[in-house]
């Protein structure tokens, strides 16, 4: 049924080639906040002319692209236990996803005389928008402005800890208190940029000549970011667990960066900048007289 729907959607496809887009590896690009897919089709042997063969091959390639995009969207993890395929059981989510696939952008196309190939996709923002209404606890909230006091954002450095990206993440203190989740964020902010920015780095977070208790802030991080990089783990249900002291700092911070989703998760840290001495990384922020429990 879904494949017949894709044939209908083909008629309304937004098709245009954008300069500068090269062929890309298909998949869910969490660190780029988008989905990339490839569609291909072979020209039918019975085509009346070479022009007709190319047109029919392109049509088949676009349908293949849409089919592949649908599979990718269905596989997007909403949380540790749920995917978008589960959410698409609801009519409003399925209709929204179908509309997104119908309006997919074609970034690049090629024709070698036999096979027509098209690359396209869309931002994960569209996926978040489709599923937002079904996420428990997500609601419209007043978004505060950062006025230079306290920490402006949160960085969770998981190092080598296995982490599977999802639309929703959950953060708890070591004692079990919920610190971050959909119930803490503004829905519009969630749709626009997601609950967190995801970064992957291949370098080691710790310089080889530094003692283990010396750490630094990623070079790309904001000056007033609260960076937590040690005594951090994943629990059995896929939640990120941080020290109680770090959780207290988040809750007492003068700017609630959770509401506008000013959170970053990295699997490894980039180049070091500065040195800090605490069992979790904690930068002194404007408006705080001293770091809490270093």
Language-model region placement:
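Bacterial N-terminal signal peptides
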Residues: 4-16
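Domain-level marker for long, solvent-exposed, non-transmembrane regions
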Residues: 18-294
């Amino acid at each position: 049924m879904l494949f017949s729907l894709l044939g209908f959607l083909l008629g309304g496809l937004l098709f245009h080639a954008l300069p500068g887009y090269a062929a890309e590896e298909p998949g869910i690009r969490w660190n780029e906040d988008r989905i990339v897919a490839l569609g291909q089709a072979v020209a039918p042997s019975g085509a009346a002319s070479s022009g007709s063969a190319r047109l029919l091959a392109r049509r088949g390639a676009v349908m293949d692209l849409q089919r592949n995009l649908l599979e990718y969207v269905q596989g997007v993890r909403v949380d540790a236990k749920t995917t978008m395929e589960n959410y698409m059981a609801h009519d409003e989510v399925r209709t929204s996803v179908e509309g997104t696939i119908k309006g997919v952008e074609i970034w690049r196309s090629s024709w070698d005389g036999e096979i027509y190939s098209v690359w396209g996709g869309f931002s994960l923002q569209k996926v978040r928008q489709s599923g937002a209404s079904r996420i428990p606890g997500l609601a419209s909230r007043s978004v505060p402005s950062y006025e230079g006091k306290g920490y402006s954002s949160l960085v969770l450095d998981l190092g080598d800890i296995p982490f599977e990206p999802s639309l929703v993440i959950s953060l708890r203190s070591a004692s079990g208190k919920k610190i971050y989740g959909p119930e803490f964020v503004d829905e519009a902010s969630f749709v626009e940029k997601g609950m967190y920015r995801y970064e992957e780095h291949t370098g080691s977070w710790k310089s080889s000549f530094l003692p283990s208790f010396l750490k630094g802030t990623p070079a790309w991080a904001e000056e007033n970011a609260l960076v937590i990089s040690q005594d951090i783990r994943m629990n059995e249900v896929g939640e990120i667990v941080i020290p109680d002291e770090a959780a207290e700092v988040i809750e007492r911070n003068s700017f609630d960066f959770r509401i506008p989703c000013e959170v970053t998760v990295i699997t490894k840290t980039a180049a070091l900048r500065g040195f800090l001495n605490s069992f979790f990384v904690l930068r002194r922020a404007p408006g705080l007289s001293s770091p809490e429990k270093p």
